[in-house]
């Protein structure tokens, strides 16, 4: 029997999962690592932490499964997108990785827009210049750390650094490369025009593959460290959201999913390229060769809930530890005591700036309507509602573009909360289906690995056979009507505060 390994490099940790050809989990292991925020709005991680987590989780899975490593036919890697990894001529990391959540590059985004032209940039890369994307991070290092930039010989994305450590190959694939702002997204190749205008050498970038293509095999050194066989193939893999799309079966028109992780995502498949000329949502190449996806991204989805838990719910965290339960269950119980609308309290979820729909690194979180009568449960529920309103903003933009999201699936850590699942259905005013497999991104890249190794004929046929959505979560029409009114007020708050946030950033 041939087995398939999926590795998911997230923001809070890495997870390795071994699957059989039927998509059943044979063994799994996770390992966490820290996030560094040396200044307000900055976010960095040490790539060595990723590699050590990969070694620990892969080796554990190989041992725990009892599978002959030679039977692991192929592996795929999913990862947090946009992070900048810079290597010298010896392949050594030159500085901590500036990751997706970092917001320091506002000036560099202005430079990119000026050098390429706003409309032309969107035509080529399908997106406006954004602080979260990789190109602005490269420009920041070039401007502020020129000595490091001069030593740079290879620029990689987070998951592709793991690929390099596993295989020795410098490679990436179209879905993740789309988030660098250096790819010709309609043409699925590096844009020489953008590279020339930004003064970035093509030689610094890795070769671009389609997601199911084989990019190499496990090296002798990686085999020794992980227990994998050198015969195990490594495929292109995918960025975290593109991988989740495969893992949730979102590989045909009309299919979409919501991810409530550290960030929040609304993602829809499209067999034809669709670009928002205002740049509010992102269009990337997807993991299905020859297709694309359109997605809206909010910076602080699950992050907002974790922040409110860590700030206000230390007693619940301690109680949950004693009871051996998830602290979020107790947090949800507090929120459930608050009515729809959180007693007229609205939360703006901009803890780390915002991407969709505002493209604003300076906006920050707000509680609007806070009064002496509000309790902890009101604040918690307001946070969950505010995140849900932010996700609905993306959904409305997709509807306006004609990108269908008829079959909406739900995944991510936030989807584990039954309370939040129902709340999302009520805010969206449409049914949701929970994915039965909790291993979305890892399963997605395992499927891609299976296609590359010849275990499956195509991405679509594999998803049809392996991925089954759960029962539908239907909206409460009465609550949905109330949320419609609250969402309209929510949408009025950003423009009212935009100038004030800009002034705050200058203080």
Mark where each language-model region is.
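Catalytic pocket of metal/acid-base enzymes, prominently hydrolases
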Residues: 203
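A short local loop/turn or secondary-structure capping micro-motif enriched for an aromatic residue
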Residues: 34-37, 103-105, 302-303
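Short beta-strand-loop/turn "lid" adjacent to the catalytic site in phosphate-handling enzymes
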Residues: 63-100, 128-134, 163-184, 207-210, ...
